[in-house]
Amino acid sequence: RAGRARELGLRTLAPGDETDVLYYMGCAAAFDERTGRSARAFVELARAAGIDLAVLADETCCGEQARRLGHEYMFQEMARQNIDNLGAVRYRRIVTQCPHCYNTMKHEYAQLGTHLEVMHYSEFLTSIRDRLPSAARARQAGGDRVTYHDSCYLGRYNQIYDEPRRLLESSGLRLTEMRRSRAGAMCCGGGGGQMWQETPPDQRINNARLEDAVAVDATVVATACPYCLQMIDDAIRSTDRSDRVKVLDIA
């Protein structure tokens, strides 16, 4: 995590330090190279808008996957460590790019008595989109046919449907909705700890979800969740469709 923070040129917060926006990277942005590139895109957009952004010097995992896999004690230990670390610094809001971290910190830490002001980065970027560089707000769609995949933790759990779509549309992209979208969207198959389970090819949820995108002739599947990004990318590779469709983070 410290290495990713240095790579992104992010200021780290020691106890007593202060920032406007505390960026909670999460494990995917810290350790996965592709999500790390999405993190860089977000950080560059925030900087271009003049946002004071910093990370915890001792950020740890939010604990969500431990709880989903039944390790409640481990989850609570991780949560308490994060809560203590967050309580030692000053900030106006927390922003994270992972819906799993977002839901955990916003709702499940509240079960432990800690109520945090947390935003998903799609919400945050939407709130400052008028301050973003014109180039970021007016990309050309080219010949791509773009569809947006709703993450379970953004959509059904937190009703964040419009913000990611507004960001894409403000970038000059025209969206084509899949048959199952918004509240009726299909899971990518990575939630509930299933990211770490091996599933027979004919039973893979991510393959079925990819078929929804292929059915509307999408050439790009956009998403705002690192789990969904990985699961849909795996489906593209396992079904040999890399020459027909790709998956990209909205940043």
What are these regions (language model features)?
Residues 1-251:
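Iron-sulfur cluster-binding electron-transfer modules in prokaryotic oxidoreductases
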